[in-house]
Regions:
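Bergerat-fold GHKL ATPase/HATPase_c domain
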Residues: 1-40, 44-55, 71-79
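Short beta-strand element(s) in the Bergerat
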Residues: 55-60, 144
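Acidic ATP/Mg2+-coordinating residue in the GHKL
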Residues: 64
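Glycine-rich G1-box
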Residues: 67-68
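GHKL/Histidine-kinase-like ATPase module
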Residues: 173-248
Length: 248
């Protein structure tokens, strides 16, 4: 494929995600799939270049303590956007490689990945045009940390922080790890992003089959929530999400 064809395909992959902050769900999925017991999301603001006092660089970081990646995984999965080691593993929630492309929906100026596994440690820097550079690190690294950097205006911080918080609560509130978000400049410390589905009531029906289950209960208005490993895949009116099951 030519560079232009690859760029067009990458743009289509980015466009498949509903919103610019959906990448947070994809990165939390990767943390789950890496076996991490926690994922820490943080937003920091740094002064921008030049003399403009309102210029800023936003640093949005997702760090986990999972199994990390070695060079073989990086070359065979993360940097080959069409390769996914998860394709045949139904216990995996994400689409490694393809899912990682979602970070570009936030339109970062750069994305930096630090990761380590089996004595290896690596740093990858992805640029806005999807080029990347890879270098080995001398010091060991635990898990994987993905850092997005984007230029903007300092007054955007509160809006970005709220969008991050909303996305995490929307998609990841039931996830099976300890998830936190810290707006560093806000000064309130880390916020735990955690909730639990309501327990089955007297009029609820639970159907468990294999590693999946269906919970049916009364709700006003009727709503459907689709989860996989605690991550919200879709949520909305039952008539839309379960069209094949609802009467005409």
């Amino acid at each position: 494929m030519s560079d232009a064809e690859v760029a067009a395909l990458l743009d289509r992959l980015v466009a498949q995600f509903e919103g610019p902050y959906d990448f947070l769900r994809e990165l939390v999925q990767n943390s789950l799939d890496a076996g991490s017991d926690r994922a820490e999301v943080a937003l920091e603001v740094h002064p921008g270049e030049g003399e403009d006092p309102d210029a800023a660089v936003f640093e949005l970081r997702v760090a986990d303590a999972g199994c990390g990646m070695d060079e073989a995984i990086l070359d065979g999965g993360l940097t080959r956007l069409f390769a996914s080691s998860k394709a045949d593993d139904r216990t995996m929630a994400g689409g490694f490689g393809i899912g990682f492309v979602s970070v570009f929906a936030w339109q970062p100026d750069a994305v930096v990945v630090h990761t380590g596994r089996a004595g290896e440690a690596w740093e990858l820097t992805f640029f806005a045009d999807r080029r990347f550079e890879k270098r080995a690190l001398a010091e060991p690294w635990e898990g994987t940390t993905v850092t997005l950097l984007r230029r903007g205006r300092a007054q955007e911080r509160a809006q970005i922080a709220e969008a991050v918080r909303d996305s995490l609560w929307r998609w990841c509130r039931f996830c099976r790890l300890e998830l936190s978000f810290e707006d560093v400049a806000g000064g309130e410390g880390p916020e735990l992003i955690q909730d639990a589905p309501a327990p089955p009531g007297a009029l609820a029906v639970v159907d468990e089959r294999g590693d999946g289950s269906v919970h049916v209960a009364f709700a006003v208005p009727p709503e459907a929530v689709m989860l996989r490993r605690g991550l919200v895949l879709a949520q909305g009116p039952a008539v839309d999400l379960l069209a094949d099951l609802t009467p005409p």
